Design a protein with these regions (language model features):
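A domain-level signal for the structural core that forms small-molecule/cofactor-binding pockets
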Residues: 1-69
Length: 69
């Protein structure tokens, strides 16, 4: 059973819509079917939306990085 976890940082003023999430889930599932020959019914896809204060890069939060700090 393939397990795919997509992590997306939340962006100020932008929301990932339900339609976009459905498209991600379907698209990633189809990719595994096409490339790896997996059964679509067995593919698990989870989307985590991460607060930019809870994600770091280069010793700074993503919020700081986006502000240019």
């Amino acid at each position: 059973m393939p397990f795919i976890n997509i992590k997306i940082t939340k962006e100020e003023g932008k929301v990932v819509s339900v339609e976009q999430k459905k498209a991600l889930i379907d698209g990633v599932s189809n990719l595994l079917v096409d490339v790896l020959g997996k059964n679509k019914a067995s593919i698990v896809v989870i989307i985590d939306e991460i607060d930019p204060d809870n994600y770091g890069l280069g010793g700074k939060t993503i919020t700081q990085v986006r502000r240019g700090e």
